[in-house]
Amino acid sequence: MACCHKVMLLVDTAGVSAPHSPARRAALRLLTYLSCRFGLARVHWTFKFFDSQGARSRPSRVSDFRELGSRSWEDFEEELEARLGDRPPGAHLPGPTPRATHTHGALMETLLDYQWDRPEITSPTKPILRSSGRRLLDADGEAREAQAALGGFGNAVFLLAPCPHSQRELLQFVSGCEAQAQRVPLTPKQVMEKVLPKRVQEVMIARNITLYWVDTTERSKLWASPDHVGYWTVCELLHHGGGTILPAETWSLGFTKARETVLPCGGELSHKPHPSPWISALPIDATVNCLLYNSEYEASFPRIEGTLFLPVQGKEIEETWAISLEPLAMHQRHFQKPVRIVLRGSVAQWSLPVSSALGTDSWMLQSPEEHRSTQRLLFQELVSRLTAEEFHLVASVDPGEGWPPITGIISPFSANAMILTVFRAKEAEFQSHFLQTAATEGSQDTASLFSDVVDSVLNQSHNLFEDPASSAPCVPEWVQQELSHTSSWSPALVEKWFPFSNASGATSDLMESFWLLHAASPDNDESSKTESELTRCLSELYQRSHEESTVVNQERSRKKRGIPRTPVRQKMNTMSRSLKMLNVARLNVKAQKLHPDGSPDTAVEKGLQKAVIGRTADKLEDRGRILRSSKLKEFKTEEELLAYIHDNYQKAVATEEITLYSCAQNMVSTIKMFLKSKDIKELEVACLSHVNSNLLKTSKTLRQNLAGKMDTEDKVGECQLQVFLRLEMCEQCPSVLDRPDEVERIVEEVTDLLRLVCLTKDSAYLSEFLEEILRLYIGSIPGTIGQLYHSLGLKIPQKLAGVLPTGFFSDDSMSQESMSPPPSSSTHRSVSAITESEQLEELRTRSAKKRRKNALIRHKSIAEISQTLRQIEVPKVSKRATRNENSHSASIQLPVPRKDTIQEVTKVRRNLFNQEMLSPSKRGLKKGLPRSHSVSALECLHHKQDKFKKTKSSTFQGYCKLLTKSVAETPVHKQISRRLLHRQIKGRSSDPGPDIHVVEESPEKEDEMTLRRSPRIKQLSFSRTNSGSFYSVSQPKSRSVQRIHSSQQESEQRENFPVQSIQSPKTLLFGALSEIPSSSKKGSAQIKRSLRSMLDSEISTSYETPKKSNQKSPSFSKTTPRRFPRTAQTLLYTPERLQNSPTEMTSAEGTISEATIKTPSSHGYNSPFASKVTSQKTVSPAKEETSPPLTKLPSTPRESDVQPPQCSSDCTWPHSVNSSPEGPYYPASPPPMAGQARSQCLTPIRYSFRTPPRTALAGTSKQQEHQELPLPRASQTQEPPQGLEKKALKIPKKPAHTSTSPLSPEEHYSGCDVSPHQPRNSLSASPPPGELNWKEHQTSPSVTSSVSCPVPSTPPRTPQRMTCPIPPSPPSKLRRSCRKKSCPPQDFPECHPGPSAAPVLSSATSPGAVTGSREEQSQFSEGQSYLGTGFRSDCHVSSPVLTASDTKCLPLIDEAQLHGLKNQEVKSGILPGEEGEEPESTIADELPSVSDPGILVPAPSSVSSSSELLPYPLCCTADGKQRQDAAQQGSPRASEATSSPQTYEVELEMQASGLPKLRIKKIDPGVLLEAEALGKEAPLGEEGALPALCMPKASKSSGRTEHPYLSPPCLRPSHSTPGKNGGQTFICQSCTPSRCPPSTPSPFQADAGVSWTPSPKQSGKTTPEIIKDWPRRKRAVDCSAGPSAGRGEASMDLPGSLSLLEPEPEGKERSLEQDLSKVLISEEFELEGVCQLPDQSPPKDSASVTEETSWGQFGLGRKRFLSAKEESEYKVKRVCDSLSEDPQASKQKECSPRWSALPLHSVGDDEVFVSGSTPPSGCMVRSCLSASGLQALTQSPLLFQGRTPSSHSTDTRDEEVDVFPSTAEESPFSHTLSRKRPFRTYTRKKLIS
């Protein structure tokens, strides 16, 4: 209400005699005044009539408050006339009831009948966005501001009625007929009780209402009043309530006749009483202001004391009166001290002289109230005498302080006040004239003084008027002419209108013509046609100019420039994200059909152009004014110029008074002026060289020069001045803008300077500075500012995006990567691959072309400019060869290949359509279909390398931190250019800290081959990398995943060495990224390689695993203690289950296992201890050993938990990883063990997950904690968080594994010699890096559950291979486990990914779940704080349900989620770069845990697992998938190995034909064990891939629980293969399911501070249901991808998955076709930020295809994809998982066919999907790798012995559904997931429609 004033006019018709009575005039003037003061929109008014004399009249209409306007005023006049007309004769006679009673009754009705306190309809609950300052005010702040600004004027009742003036009238008013009998005067209290009783006062106070009485007494009655006691009594009463009386004269001013205000010069006195001319001389507004805001105005018109000397006859001593003087105008000169006023004489008929030569100041004289009453009476008597005689006194005013006396005239003003008019010094002659006259009378007494002075002064006065000097015109001639026509001009009019008119060029002739026009009668036809034509033309001209100005103002005031606010958009803002995305997609499809040519609606463009032109013009005009005002000096010599400039420069830096902007502008302008040249270009070139040589300093120079010399403020000021100088160069020398290289150089320098500023100032300061830059330069050089934002990795603000050219967001401009692959790279592709890729390329370019025209043709109702740019790079050449070489080369080689594509970007724009941008290393990855690749920036921290094992340091020059990742599969419009990446990295490099390297990661793992592996393992990893057999391998790691890997590594390092990374500007700007990367530092080299070869999911897995290991190990450790006490028992009872838990808990082991799987021969079997120590990455041997230990450890989860060695192993593992960054780190060797461990852990983890839904939660907490550690924002203990962070980061990688195989965590633990108990220890060590995780596990059973959860996660991963089917089962088992552990509720909730977010919340909510949830939340909050809001939410999705769902949907969701996450992240406020990458990575960290839970049971654990798994899920984007694949590759093997003695490795290989080929290899038991260990890890990785995918989904789901829905279709197979193939993954920004978050109010999120409901931004990313639906099948296949996608990613992943699938289809035709159709549609939507729904291909088919592809890769999707060997491997993995989980998996499969593929995975995946996507697409579970799907895979004959594989695509779904139902039986999550999935299905159909 503070924003709007409610005004009620309460009109007493008894005092109204005629329609044009004072009441009407007062009402009109009052409303005019209010509207002028507050604005028409801020005043709402209404009126009410009553009769104070009791006369009956028709009831007054009660209309609500309305805005001021002519219509409402007409209503008032009509009602007034009707009442006056209806009034019967005699109605004016007073009745028996007193007037006060009627007035009181009317007042009470007014207060009670109207809604004074109703809020504005337009903004019922929203804070008002003030136009000034553009800041949001809450209700209290708004009220306070309104009070301050409006002087307390809130709501008001204006009582328009005659006010009693005399005491007798007051008596009659209060007592009515009794007044005759009552002679006793009324006391104020009696009057108050009658007029304003306490009840009325209370109501007024409660509603902030003030009562003002507008006196409408007729003037004749006013003068007839004998006294004014009644008036002052009423006035005093009103003052108590803040009101007052507004006198009648206030409203009649300006309407008086001339003879009443100005006496004629004849000297004949008017016999009619009239107010002082002074009253009419005061402007009405000023009078009303003074009355309404008395206290405020008193401050503006300060009173001073004075003394009035009256000469007394016969006395030398003059009588003195104390008086107070109050200025009448604010601008007049004030007296400095008490003033002496001496009366000299008197004058009659004096009026203010109208003379330009006469200057006057006016003061009001009053007798101070505090002085004795006798003096006041005398003063009043003097005033009344002067009024009666109409005399004025002449006085000499002595201002003191040596100033000469001044002549003044004292005039009567009111009953107790006079006006002193002082003539200023220039009227000396006039003053002396008066003084001489007055002096002659000085000796007479006061009485005679008056009469005598009158005579003399009258003569003086005649002389005065005749005096030509004094009569000189004081105003222009035309004004005199106007005044001569009429004397009725009011002072207000003269004061306001004439000056304005004069300034506008009015002349006598013009005014004369106006008079002539006015004089002509309306019906006179003599007016010439030309006159009328002129009038018409003038009116048109004025109207047009007015309209144009209005348009410009509207443009300026529009909040979102260039984006029309349509009813549809307004409506959609209130929808859930999923619905919104659905409708956007639907409308966009319509728009595409309407504009097939891609021509966009031009309305927006035109509006934009107009706005830009208008703003540019304004900018130029403003600049012109500034330049004119700055009076540029002219210099004769260059030395003078330089001296002047140098002087100015120093002053600007030294003093804060000079604005740096104006100083820079002035200096550049001065130089330009000095270099006068006729040729503009020459001038600009000379000016630039001058500025460059004399003014500009580089950031390096500044850093060196300012090192110790200046204080921080000066440093910052100089940096800012340098920024302004460069921007001014661009602005004032436009020719610079024609040279892109120069602009780029300038932008880079500005970026460096801003980073320098960040060394001493926080990010908020930088934001303010950037806003200032934006405000100053948006109109002139928006493109340069846009590049600056890109360079900083910041999201482009809406208002800047509105003015940027459309080409700015296209690949050609900003997204071009500085390093494009050599053309020769294309030769790697086979002919068939080229054909397929050409088809895809055609699709890409077609969409890209449309995008360039206006990206996607959006329905005009929702058309808006896309902001987020991510680069998806699609390598033209298959990356396989390169990856394989890199893989073989060793982890150390990984960095080298990565260097080819070293990108320096904080935020990477993924170029989905630009294959040229791929680096050679990525190009060769997939030969069939070019798979998108990821580029990651690694920060090598030399100082950290000492703290960590140097295995990696040798590779990456020390501990490497994964800073950024670029995923090739991201739509172009969401990509960040490589140039940006380089710039950002460069910027980071400017920091004396770590070196930054770019690690390119492609879905294909080129580096994988580099690892020393047995051919079989190589093939497995290769298939994973290329075909994404287990999404971890095939799925490109998302940047987030990479980050998480790096974070995990860093976490491991931290675990080993709990030292928090140093905070630097880099940390500030890219903290999230760098933090996670820091975890990766150990695995940084690995990551680099891993990122590349991570495409060989192994490294990914390994990387992630190690991180996860660190994170998860500790996480699991911690989880295990908490949840694992039970879980431990369970684990003890069920070694497999135990393993699962430990695996999840021991992310490092899982990672190691995965690594072992990848390089089983080299590392996996070499040194188990090393593996443990080295963490998955370095632990090829360690992994092998680890795997067995893991297997054993799972048996003794508690032991594992308790084992400090585990923790140290975990920590050591990262070191180990460092030691052998390339080889060991590479999961190549470790994978076997990882597989083994994974398998072992898978089942246990599954069980754990089952039991551990809480554990998952706890794990999630733990993971979150770990994540926190990596995250600079981590809220938990810094050091432990660091450890946790490392762990979390590792865990995230592990989560990828975990998601792949919940075993992964256990495996990690095993690998790290950490049994479930040991993981607890690890967690315990989390405070130290390792201990924290362990502690967390111990701390929260939930965490343990979380650990368990990862196991299910692992199964999904295994499904990729063998684990996938198993994971579903494990989820059931996990649930059972949870129940067994007395955590069923938790397990149930967490295991209910199917139900989607809700289940997750449920699980979190359950006691265990809550514990895990809280722990996870805390961790999560850290991670989330790191990730940002979006990620937190996502991570929180870690609830089991989400995880399971995630697992399933991971691939697709991974991508979608990744994008969604990025988007969320951005929305969350993370830097775009950080957002895109860090969120993924962080999500990976946290999501892994979620992913694990994503495995249904793992869902709770999933949080923890998600953390580990998440990296891979996050990887779901091409990049994320690559990482996930990498992680999963290693991980799946591990899970396989772990699961069963007979292990089959399924390798998805991209054939030359472009079709993916599944290779199923049989792994010997030893390898299998290793694989199992790795598999457990891989399951974490693989299910991590699935669950990880799931987890990312879950993770995102936590941010937005929707992810689970989306990912499945794109899971590992499609995601991995396509991604690796370079296929583009469409990321459905808008597809991010919002369902998950809303449905999962898990305690995790609550604790983490992350909303379980999707954040608005997250919601915005909700994947349309349709999109989610079709990919769902594929996602089921792409279980891991799904989880990776996470909810944000899920949405994008649908398209992204599709695109991934597409790329995979390049490798795999079957997948390709469906993908293509999806991609086509996706692409178009992609432009919109929403994947287009595949109209062409049936959603389910597409999903199926993708699913099959994914499953094929996973071993779950399609049987055809699973070669016997691969299926066997999957089986093996699954067997391992299913050892414990199998029954449940089967149950899940049986229960929900749909979940069959998803069951385990389903928990997270579906949950994620459910949560992530409002549509039931989640329900469809994408059939990627749900927990059930994993189980189905596990059970499938191919994948598992004794198990029939469920149909990979359709069956997988069915199995998944079945498994899920079984899961559902076990846990409500399953059922919930089931329900949600169907919903998703419907959504998908809707989208297609």
Swiss-Prot record:
GO cellular component, one term: nucleus
Biased composition (Basic and acidic residues): 1705-1714
Gene Ontology biological process terms from the UniProt entry: DNA repair; DNA replication; mitotic DNA replication checkpoint signaling; mitotic G2 DNA damage checkpoint signaling; regulation of DNA-templated DNA replication initiation; response to ionizing radiation
Gene Ontology MF annotations: chromatin binding
Pfam families linked to this entry: Treslin_M, Treslin_N, Treslin_STD
Broad class of the protein's primary localization: nucleus
Biased composition (Low complexity): 812-832, 1187-1197, 1339-1351, 1496-1508
Modified residues (Phosphoserine): 295, 599, 820, 861, 919, 934, 1002, 1027, 1078, 1141, 1406
Entry superkingdom: Eukaryota
Compositional bias per record (Polar residues), positions renumbered to this chain: 1020-1050, 1127-1179, 1203-1219, 1525-1543, 1652-1662
Localization in the cell: Nucleus
Stretch list, region Disordered: 812-836, 979-1063, 1098-1421, 1471-1508, 1520-1543, 1630-1714, 1730-1751, 1841-1875
InterPro entries in UniProt: Treslin, Treslin_M, Treslin_N, Treslin_STD
Post-translational modification Phosphothreonine, affected residues: 1134
UniProt entry keywords in alphabetical sequence: Cell cycle, DNA damage, DNA repair, Nucleus, Phosphoprotein
Comp. bias regions, Basic residues: 1373-1382
Signal peptide: none
Assembly and binders: Interacts with TOPBP1 (via BRCT domains); interaction takes place in a CDK2-dependent manner. Component of the replisome complex composed of at least DONSON, MCM2, MCM7, PCNA and TICRR.
Functional note: Regulator of DNA replication and S/M and G2/M checkpoints. Regulates the triggering of DNA replication initiation via its interaction with TOPBP1 by participating in CDK2-mediated loading of CDC45L onto replication origins. Required for the transition from pre-replication complex (pre-RC) to pre-initiation complex (pre-IC). Required to prevent mitotic entry after treatment with ionizing radiation.
Recorded family membership: Belongs to the treslin family.
Designated name of the protein: Treslin
Organism encoding this protein: Mus musculus (Mouse)
High-level lineage: Eukaryota, Metazoa, Chordata, Craniata, Vertebrata
